Amino acid sequence: MSLTNKNVVFVAGLGGIGLDTSRELVKRDLKNLVILDRIDNPAAIAELKAVNPKVTVTFYPYDVTVPVAETTKLLKTIFAQIKTIDVLINGAGILDDHQIERTIAVNYTGLVNTTTAILDFWDKRKGGPGGIICNIGSVTGFNAIYQVPVYSGSKAAVVNFTSSLAKLAPITGVTAYTVNPGITKTTLVHKFNSWLDVEPRVAEKLLEHPTQTSQQCAENFVKAIELNKNGAIWKLDLGTLEPITWTKHWDSGI
């Protein structure tokens, strides 16, 4: 899929991986890049505009933990402004297993709520045009970092939820896939807390393993968006992009 003249809404598009991905996106000659983030960063927005002045870059403050109704209201404003949204990227995430409720609220519930809100506009059963959802998971959604089971569990939930969305595409008209970064050099992994402090040195130990830069991750992130494969589970690790084949152990039969 060519991203030229597309309208993309990026939740958490100013974070570590997010900002580098936003830089790559504007190079693709989007029509609009709408960034929803909790904290404004005028310098980063100005930089993105300078990378490609042809792209309209807009920022709206957004906390993914707000009720669905508030998200729907914000999306209504965005649709009124740019008329169509082609791609939604759900990228909000925290890594701190001391904050159990907030980890689940940001990493999973917020993603589900944002998705639910945009279906109000996209669902073909309501006369919507359909759309594309790219959800950011993590390799911990495949195999946990067991010292951070809350974070890992939230990312496993993202993979499962997104796979369900993909299978619902014939009904809703909305396709979906996950991008799942491996250990990436961002502030997220420099210092974080393990669950019940089972491993106080978890961040230090994790960074002893091979990593990738946020730029490497961003480049593959945008490649995955351009490939636009419904139901794909992409692994973005060590500077590579690889599709994951999920093993089926059970089928509901419905």
Swiss-Prot record:
Subunit details: Homodimer.
GO terms under biological process: alcohol metabolic process
Cleaved signal peptide residues: none
PANTHER family: ALCOHOL DEHYDROGENASE
Residues reported to bind substrate: S138
EC number(s) given by UniProt: 1.1.1.1
Active site, renumbered: Y151
CDD domains: ADH_SDR_c_like (cd05323)
Reaction(s) catalysed (UniProt annotation): a primary alcohol + NAD(+) = an aldehyde + NADH + H(+); a secondary alcohol + NAD(+) = a ketone + NADH + H(+)
Pfam families assigned: adh_short
Domain of life from the UniProt record: Eukaryota
Designated name of the protein: Alcohol dehydrogenase
Single GO MF descriptor: alcohol dehydrogenase (NAD+) activity
Keyword entries, A-Z: NAD, Oxidoreductase
Family: Belongs to the short-chain dehydrogenases/reductases (SDR) family.
Gene Ontology CC, one term: cytosol
Residue positions binding NAD(+): 10-33
Gene: Adh
